[in-house]
Each structure stands twice: as C-alpha cells, then as structure tokens.
Amino acid sequence: EPLRFTQLARPLDFAAVTDHAELFGEVEICTNPDAPGFLSPECVLYRSFPEQSFLIFNLAAVGLPELPQFPVPEGVPVVSDLPVIGSDGRIPRLPYCGLNGERCLEAAKTPWRDTQRAAEAFYDRSDACRFTTFVGYEWTGAPLSNNLHRNVIFASEVVPEIPPAYQETPAPELLWDALDERCREADGCAWLSIPHTS
C-alpha cells in the first residue's frame, strides 16, 4: 500500500520513447538470423542467457576493461577480446560488429527507423493536436560506471540517419558536437539534450 498517491490534474499530451542507442545495432544483429554475426559467441550468449548478457553487453558498451572477470554460466563461450577504452578515448564495439563497428552501425538504422515510425504513428497531426510524440533516444554515458545519461529529443521528424552513441562520443561535449554536425537547423533538424539520473 503506497503512503501517498499523486496524479496530474490532466494527462500529459506528449511523449518520447528514448531507447539506449549504444546497443541498437548489436541487438539487431543478435536477433536477426540473416545478419552476419548472428552466430557469434556474443550473440549466442545474448540469446541463451539474457540476464547475464544484459550485464556483459552493457558493460561492453561503456568500455570497461577485463570484462571476462564477471561470472559466465558454464558452457557459454568466454569472450576474451571484449572492448576496452582505446587511447583515443573511444570505445570499440563488440567483435562481431566488424571493422570500426560498421556492421553494428549499419544494423542500428533498423531500430532507429522503427523508433521514428512509432513516433509518427502516434502523433496527432490533426488540428486538434491532442497528443505529440517526439523522436528521441538515450545516450548512455557511463564512464567507469558513473551515470551521465542524456535523453536526446528531436523537434521534428527530421533526425540524423544514426544517432550518436556513447561508443563514438564518450563525453557530453562530443555528443553535442556530433549532434550539431548531424542535425543541422538549416535542414529542419533541431535537438535538445536532457541529463537524467546524473
């Protein structure tokens, strides 16, 4: 039984679903049997042991070294070359992502398009405009497991082809620079970055 109950006087008339961009492509590959990398040890782990893989995938996305120290269930392949933070400060993607993470970056376009389609499907563009949906995502900054997440919300349906993720932009300033580069007001794109759980 809750101690108190709070309810807004009127419901919100806007929403944005902000999924974590860091694993858009990785999860797409692991769940698509036609994708190169579907049979990789990491994807087998992802599908076979979802709870353990959640931890390992998320730690890999923030670039912590020595990830094999975490317990892995018996019979699961141990990945010895999980990403570590590079000398340039960037975080390489999982091995099945290919050279420079290109496979995962390409695969990330599918869930990102799904996000855009969902926002458009529920946007009331009638004169009544009863509900507004925004395209958005979460940039999951977590240096050394510190929580520096940002919700990135776009003002219109004009958005970058791929949202900048923490692996490519491992600092808020790098995120903002990448957003400025990929989301130009002259092209009808505008963004807002909102820190949360910082």
Regions found by a protein language model. Give the residues of each.
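Extended, charged catalytic domains and RNA/DNA-binding interfaces, predominantly
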Residues: E1-S198
